[in-house]
């Protein structure tokens, strides 16, 4: 695999040890804005967390609207760790920029204010909100997804992951909240704060190839007994709007929930336990618990295929309206991990309980919620019978009409983040 270099990093790979102003500052080709907060008028704050917020802003000279993500890195106990994570997210976004990836939000610039202790990202404003809130609204309105609609959205997720993985990146936090809906109704994969650059792109069975092994030194949970409401939970399972969990719409999710400190039960997470050891390769404990692959939970080597486990969990929820590994709003993170560890029996029970579902959907769920060595990658998934009738070339070129297209009144319309 060729080393992936970014414009501001001439002689190194992504993820340096201690980012500073010189290496954090970035500006995309053709962007006319300046690298300072005074160049932007804040229109609205659409989300906030314990150490960050997301605003909609208008750049003063061009009058263009953007999403601005702010991370207050002095608000946490391990400042350098936050800096590393912030730069990792920035680097993943720049890689997507360089590849002209239309399935990721474009990063226009990033800069740091060391005096105030703030990281800034100026990004494309994805105005349709997050996929989780859209799913919840549909369920509230009694509009269950048809299999054709599910097929469309899962196919778009496959394409999002295929592109991301082709750059040698793992996402590691694939969930409905981190999928955005653009103005045309297509899915965009966001929040790269948990992303990881792989060692190389070789390997069989869809794996990247070599993976590093380090001791498990962290736990995702804020505490073993902490109560967690699934981001897709309503009653005994199902979709819940993102802004019910401490953030408005997708502001705390698709534009970067992890790096804003949002927790599922409105309790700020233990930042050190959440982010410790962010650069240790494939055994670091990163991701949203109910979507984490079993190999991640168990702390063994993992690859890009961990993202397809998450895809399988999302597919199950779209088909059934139920969260696969979350039994109730009182389910603890520790219990979720236990459920994932016992996934074979739980999956069989859940599938039987939620019949009828098509054989094709059940088959794809079972292929994704499976041991890593048997799990398909994007090229294999695209051949699955579930996607019969899908024209992948047309999908890749955004030529297939989405089931839903946002109705927007202006370039700064934030209605999908407040309703």
Curated annotation (Swiss-Prot):
Residues that coordinate or bind ATP: 46-54, 69
EC number annotated for this UniProt entry: 2.7.11.1
Residue span, Protein kinase domain: 40-387
Pfam families, per the entry: Pkinase
Keywords: ATP-binding, Kinase, Nucleotide-binding, Serine/threonine-protein kinase, Transferase
Top-rank taxon, per record: Eukaryota
Family in the record: Belongs to the protein kinase superfamily. AGC Ser/Thr protein kinase family.
Protein name per the record: Probable serine/threonine-protein kinase DDB_G0290859
């Amino acid at each position: 695999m060729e080393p992936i270099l970014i414009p501001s990093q001439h002689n190194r790979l992504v993820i340096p040890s201690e980012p500073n102003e010189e290496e954090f500052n970035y500006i995309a080709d053709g962007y006319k804005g300046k690298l300072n907060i005074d160049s932007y008028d804040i229109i609205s704050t659409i989300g906030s967390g314990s150490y960050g917020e997301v605003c909609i802003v208008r750049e003063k000279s061009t009058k263009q609207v953007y999403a601005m993500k702010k991370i207050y890195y002095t608000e946490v106990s391990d400042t350098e760790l936050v800096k590393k994570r912030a730069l990792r997210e920035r680097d993943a976004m720049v890689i997507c920029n360089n590849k002209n990836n239309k399935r990721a939000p474009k990063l226009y610039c990033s800069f740091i204010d060391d005096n105030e202790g703030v990281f800034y990202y100026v990004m494309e404003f994805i105005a349709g909100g997050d996929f989780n809130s859209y799913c919840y609204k549909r369920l509230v309105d009694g509009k269950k997804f048809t299999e054709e609609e599910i097929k469309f959205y899962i196919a778009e997720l496959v394409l999002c992951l295929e592109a991301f993985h082709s750059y040698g990146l793992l996402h590691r936090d694939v969930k409905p909240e981190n999928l955005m809906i653009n103005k045309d109704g297509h899915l965009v994969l966001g929040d790269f704060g948990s992303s990881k650059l792989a060692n190389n792109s070789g390997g069989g069975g869809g794996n990247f190839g070599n993976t590093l092994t380090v001791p498990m030194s962290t736990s995702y949970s804020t505490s073993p007994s902490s109560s967690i409401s699934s981001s897709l939970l309503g009653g005994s399972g199902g979709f819940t709007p993102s802004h019910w969990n401490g953030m408005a719409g997708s502001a705390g999710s698709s534009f970067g929930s992890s790096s804003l400190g949002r927790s599922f039960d409105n309790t700020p997470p233990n930042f050190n336990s959440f982010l410790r050891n962010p650069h240790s390769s494939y055994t670091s404990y990163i991701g949203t618990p109910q979507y984490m692959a079993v190999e991640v939970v168990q702390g063994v080597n993992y690859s890009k295929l961990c993202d397809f486990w998450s895809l399988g969990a999302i597919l199950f929820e779209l088909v059934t309206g139920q969260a696969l590994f979350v039994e109730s709003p009182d389910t603890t993170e520790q219990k979720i991990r236990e459920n994932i560890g016992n996934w074979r029996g739980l999956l069989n029970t859940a599938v039987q309980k939620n019949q009828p579902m098509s054989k094709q959907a059940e088959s794809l769920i079972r292929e994704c919620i499976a041991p890593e060595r048997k799990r398909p990658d994007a090229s294999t998934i695209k051949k699955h019978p579930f996607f019969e009738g899908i024209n992948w070339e047309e999908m890749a070129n955004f030529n297939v009409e989405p089931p839903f297209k946002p109705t927007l009144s202006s370039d700064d319309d934030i209605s999908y983040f407040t309703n």
